[in-house]
């Protein structure tokens, strides 16, 4: 199983490599790279099953973010796991934001990786591994409300603008927190911004 690790932190690279080797991946199938250009070449050459990327490797340069987005789209059979670069926040969850794109905390546990990668690690030639996770999506109301919330508007302002009761706004906020698996506003904003960066945004259910 070919894998790519794009993370400037040697501690993380070592941890991920150790995890993969312990699960039967051969060392020669684990490729460390540093730049987005190298990632594009490596994905084309190796057709990896899984790519681990630290968002710090691309988030500060719009052209790099755009290229990451293209690479993810060009390799639908590769699972991309993007680690959030967010400090001093307890969040060890992960979210599937596209069929082949997962946003994760760096604090993800080996057991969680086993759950996510189990089928892929066991994958025999010609059998595609899949992730049994719902893709993150919001209703139109939740999506509109989340944007206002991120603009710094409070419950009453959102209630007035959307012409709904404050209690309903609070209920929608609760749904958003449940779907993004955190009550931490900083993490919610971070997930939204990162998803916007490498996709066209969190899926909105148009029904």
UniProtKB/Swiss-Prot annotation:
Q: List UniProt keywords, sorted A-Z.
A: DNA-binding, Sensory transduction, Transcription, Transcription regulation
Superkingdom of origin organism: Bacteria
Mind telling me which Gene3D superfamilies this protein's record contains? Answer: Winged helix-like DNA-binding domain superfamily/Winged helix DNA-binding domain
UniProt GO MF annotations: DNA binding
Query: HAMAP family, per this entry?
Result: RcsA (MF_00982)
Q: Which family does it belong to?
A: Belongs to the RcsA family.
> Its function?
Component of the Rcs signaling system, which controls transcription of numerous genes. Binds, with RcsB, to the RcsAB box to regulate expression of genes.
What is the name of the protein in this document?
A: Transcriptional regulatory protein RcsA
Q: What is the lineage of its organism?
A: Bacteria, Pseudomonadati, Pseudomonadota, Gammaproteobacteria, Enterobacterales
Q: What gene name is listed for this protein?
A: rcsA
């Amino acid at each position: 199983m070919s894998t790519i690790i794009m993370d400037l932190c040697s501690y993380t690279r070592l941890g991920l490599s150790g995890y993969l080797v312990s699960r039967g991946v051969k060392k020669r199938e684990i490729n460390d790279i540093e730049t987005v250009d190298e990632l594009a070449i490596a994905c084309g050459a190796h057709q990896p099953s899984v790519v681990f990327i630290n968002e710090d490797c691309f988030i500060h340069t719009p052209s790099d973010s755009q290229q990451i987005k293209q690479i993810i789209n060009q390799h639908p059979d590769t699972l991309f796991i993007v680690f959030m670069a967010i400090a001093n926040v307890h969040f060890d969850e992960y979210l599937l934001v596209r069929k082949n794109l997962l946003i994760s905390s760096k604090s993800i546990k080996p057991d969680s990786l086993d759950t996510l990668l189990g089928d892929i690690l066991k994958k025999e030639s010609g059998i595609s591994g899949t992730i049994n996770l719902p893709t993150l999506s919001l209703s139109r109301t939740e999506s509109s409300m989340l944007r206002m919330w991120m603009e710094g508007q409070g419950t009453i302002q959102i209630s007035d603008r959307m012409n709904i009761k404050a209690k309903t706004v609070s209920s929608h906020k609760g749904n958003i927190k449940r779907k993004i698996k955190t009550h931490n506003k900083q993490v919610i904003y971070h997930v939204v911004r990162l998803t916007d960066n490498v996709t066209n945004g969190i899926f909105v259910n148009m029904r």
